[in-house]
């Protein structure tokens, strides 16, 4: 993860719990499962700090709503695909300089709490 430089802000969305179709086994194809999504986003925030106006900030609510809609309305065979599609949604915002997306699938393995995939993008 890039170092946080002066004038930059780091936004973290933690444990966004959604339900979707994820997996390749029959029961996964037929039944929605929980996934936990964690986001880290870096963007230049000097204007937002100075002006104190949402028009100058990265609106994490807008990004989160787009992710919720996309994840809940689609089906995914692989965590890798879901993670990349979420990362693509985040990176659509031109203010984003760096983003990291982790998708966690609880109880994906019998003796593990969860399995997760993390992908990152930057410009």
From Swiss-Prot:
Disruption phenotype: Deletion of the gene abolishes intra- and extracellular monapterin production. GO terms for cellular component: cytoplasm; cytosol. Keywords: Isomerase. It catalyses: 7,8-dihydroneopterin 3'-triphosphate = 7,8-dihydromonapterin 3'-triphosphate. One of its GO terms (molecular function) is dihydroneopterin aldolase activity. It is an enzyme of class 5 (isomerase). CDD domains: DHNA_DHNTPE. The keyword Transmembrane does not apply. InterPro entries: Dihydroneopterin_aldolase (IPR006156), FolB_dom (IPR006157), GTP-CH-I_C/QueF (IPR043133). It holds the Pfam family FolB. Belongs to the DHNA family. This is Dihydroneopterin triphosphate 2'-epimerase.
């Amino acid at each position: 993860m890039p170092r946080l430089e002066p004038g930059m802000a780091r936004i973290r969305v933690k444990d966004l719990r959604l339900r979707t179709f994820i997996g390749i086994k029959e029961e996964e194809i037929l039944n929605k499962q929980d996934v936990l999504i964690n986001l880290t986003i870096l963007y230049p925030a000097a204007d937002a700090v100075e002006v104190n106006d949402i028009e100058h900030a990265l609106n994490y609510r807008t990004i989160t709503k787009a992710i919720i809609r996309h994840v809940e309305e689609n089906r995914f065979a692989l965590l890798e695909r879901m993670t990349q599609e979420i990362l693509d949604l985040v990176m659509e915002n031109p203010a984003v300089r760096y983003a990291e997306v982790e998708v966690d699938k609880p109880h994906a393995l019998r003796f593990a709490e969860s399995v997760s995939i993390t992908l990152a993008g930057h410009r």
